[in-house]
Amino acid sequence: MRTIGVISDTHGLLREEAVDALKDSDLILHAGDVGGAGILEVLSGIAPVFVVKGNNDYDEGASNWPKREVVHLSEGTSPVLAYMLHDISDLDLDPSSVGFAVVVYGHSHRPAMEWSGGVLYFNPGAAGHRRFNLPVTVGRLRVDERGRVSSEIIELEETI
């Protein structure tokens, strides 16, 4: 079983609770609006990190981040591919027709897990500052040996 931590919209705040929730990840996906490369440095101390640029990522390092990313979530013979982007309204392809099992996105700060056409559309919500009266969350994907994907949203206890 492979565990993928998913985080988005940290906006410069990486909560200790988020780090704890992601600590057993084999891979971490950040769906944008990071708010500084220091956050990625901390996350990369846990597991390899993939990131896409969000609409508020203006710092110097962010200029090199892709707007879209393809990530292999599984190891072995049955590949499980994820397509990452920050804003789902910028989705520029039909994920099921090109073989993606998961679309990971952020931007709205609203956690979401929805299956459509055999594809999981997954937004971990926002892990940074609370906004819009929404919970502070991260996500987790699990991929088993047969390539089956399961997902969960983890609501964080706030200490800030």
What residues fall within each predicted segment?
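Structural motif
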Residues: I4, L27, V80-A82, V102
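N-terminal active-site segment of His-dependent metallophosphoesterases
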Residues: M1-V49, D57-K67, L134-T137, I160
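Short, solvent-exposed aromatic-acidic interface loops
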Residues: S150-I160
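General small-molecule cofactor/ligand-binding pocket signal
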Residues: G5, F50, H72, E152-I154
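Helix-adjacent hinge/juxtasegments
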Residues: F50-D90, S97-G99
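Active-site metal-binding loops of divalent metal-dependent hydrolases
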Residues: S8-G12, G32-V34, N55-D57, H86-S89, ...
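Conserved beta-sheet core of the metallophosphoesterase superfamily
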Residues: F50, L81, I88-E152
